[in-house]
Amino acid sequence: MRGKFICLDGTEGSGKSSQIQAICSFLQQHGKTVITTREPGGTQIGEAIRELVLSPHYQPQALTELLLILAARHEHLQTVILPHLAAGTWVISDRFNDATYAYQGYGRGIDLKIIKTLEQIIQASFQPDLACILCLPEHIAAERVHNRAHDHDRIELENRAFFARVAQGYHARAQLPHARFIDASGDQNSVFQQIRHHLELLL
């Protein structure tokens, strides 16, 4: 039986990493074989692209950034996601295509039609079985990012106007059939209970 592809997406500070761990534990308790991955990244080539895209030492043009991320996605999809799904493994990804529309589309201002055209080339009709889009008020997200212990990457250093546009993009994407809006402003357990409801429908 084919595995399921689940994505967690949302603005910086939305708590995706903690929820991915909770999702994996839940699915494993229900007898599922699970792997986790991330975008950009997930492959050797993808991780190299991730370093380029997130490094504060580079300032790529918006379209360059988009094409790099999509190149990483093609490699990721063909060599990791699709083979594991075919083998019956459930794949949990930290970000996928909703992030591209939110960050490069709404955030950078790239025409959404361009993104859609490129998406169809790379993904054809492939979409996640479930995309949980974690949304929270901008001031809470900014505080969480500020309190992170590690050095901030290039995206985390963007201004508040950029993140407001990204949040707008995520709210729009959360209305699509494959996506579910998740209120990420509460504690980890309350957020997971929302996600759990949608997971149970996939089992």
From Swiss-Prot:
Domain of life: Bacteria
Catalysed transformations (reactions): dTMP + ATP = dTDP + ADP
EC number: 2.7.4.9
Annotated GO CC locations: cytosol
Gene3D superfamilies named in the record: P-loop containing nucleotide triphosphate hydrolases
Pfam family, one: Thymidylate_kin
Binding site for ATP: 10-17
A molecular function GO annotation: dTMP kinase activity
InterPro entries hit by this protein: P-loop_NTPase, Thymidylate_kin-like_dom, Thymidylate_kinase
GO biological process, alphabetically ordered: dTDP biosynthetic process; dTTP biosynthetic process; dUDP biosynthetic process
Record's keyword terms, sorted: ATP-binding, Kinase, Nucleotide biosynthesis, Nucleotide-binding, Transferase
Keyword ATP-binding: yes
PANTHER family: THYMIDYLATE KINASE, UMP-CMP KINASE 2, MITOCHONDRIAL
Family: Belongs to the thymidylate kinase family.
UniProt function note: Phosphorylation of dTMP to form dTDP in both de novo and salvage pathways of dTTP synthesis.
Name of the featured protein: Thymidylate kinase
Organism: Dichelobacter nodosus (strain VCS1703A)
